[in-house]
Amino acid sequence: MVNMNILTTVALAGLAAAKTVEVVVAENGGLTFTPNQIKADVNDIVHFKLAKSGHDISSGPFDMPCKPSDNSLYSGKLNEGDEFSVNITNTDPIWLYCSVSKHCSKGMVAVINPPSSGNTIEAYKQAAAGAGNGQAPSRVNNGSSGSGTPTSGGAPAATSPNAASSLTFSGAAALVAMGGAWIGLL
């Protein structure tokens, strides 16, 4: 029989390696993502916190700023205090924008895992300036949202139609859940 202590240690070490990267949306009422260049590894969580109501988080291709691509991530319109989390599954660049009104064309853009050369956040912002109104994806997708109020399980309360099936736990909550599951198997 495999030593359960070894399995537990390996499982918890993998979870502990993942991190949560915090991004503030509309900090101080501005049309900003702070930071606007986000470095995240595979299995990290990028966690967006809304500082002011009336924004969203959308993604699209570099060469079509302010427009969604197929299977874009999309938070839906969020209010002050709402949160949206995205689990990073690869290190390809993810170009972000706010699709509300002309927020994108006014510079409300960001990138997860910017390339080391070539397409820059400055070039994306400049191209977005001529894009007019932003376009939202057709549905909430590729993330989980919550009110920021923890449930008894420690995760944000689900508020989007698909949030319950894709809800991501914070590192601490995941460690507690995994530890409890392994102890239950012993």
Curated annotation (Swiss-Prot):
One of its GO terms (cellular component) is extracellular region. Binds 1 copper ion per subunit. Disulfide bonds join C66-C104. Cu cation binds at H55, C98, H103. GO terms for molecular function: metal ion binding. It is a lipid-anchor; GPI-anchor. The keyword Membrane applies. Residues 130-160 are annotated as: Disordered. Probable electron transfer copper protein that serves as a direct electron donor. This is Probable GPI-anchored cupredoxin ARB_05732-1.
